[in-house]
Amino acid sequence: MVMVPSVAATAAIGVALAQGALAASFSVSGQSFKVTADKLEGTGFSQYGAIDSGYTLKGEKTAHPVAVSAFSSADITNMCQSVVTPDLPIIGSVSLTLKAGGKGTPVHAENLYIDVEDLQADATFTNIDIGVAAGDMKNGPGPGMKGGKETANKYGFGQQAESAVLTDVKQTAWATTAGTFKLSGLKMSLSKGVKECY
């Protein structure tokens, strides 16, 4: 098992609506979300640093440093995503939980990007290159940078690998973008209070 520093081990997982093309950029909400998965198996991995601009829950502008992880293709087993909306009138906090990818049919994503703030996982990378100029990763095994209005330095630090396997994944993220995202066995639930995936 190869353990790479946290920026290298960032898992590209999350829940998002299926999209036909990659969004260049968007303002992130004032809420990060948590994701867990038993396993992620991906091909064509790339990663680099960026800034996500967005808002607080009070509407003030803010920004978040993130590690953007990208996969050309990824299969995710037993995925859970949770987000908590705090301080709603009368009822207080409400938790939204989404689960998918169980019963032998993993979640499948193509051209997947996830903007991650924190990650815990065991990770194994195959044929990894660390220290690649981020803008040059478009010529590597992964999808490279998003482009568009993204706030990232194409001459900055990047890394790429032919494949990656991550197990026992726990992460906090601000955004996910995917070309396609198939959520097998999707179940959504709402509950009062704080009930997160971890």
Segments predicted by a language model, with ranges:
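Extended, solvent-exposed, non-transmembrane regions
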Residues: T10-Y198
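N-terminal export and membrane-targeting signals
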Residues: M1-A8
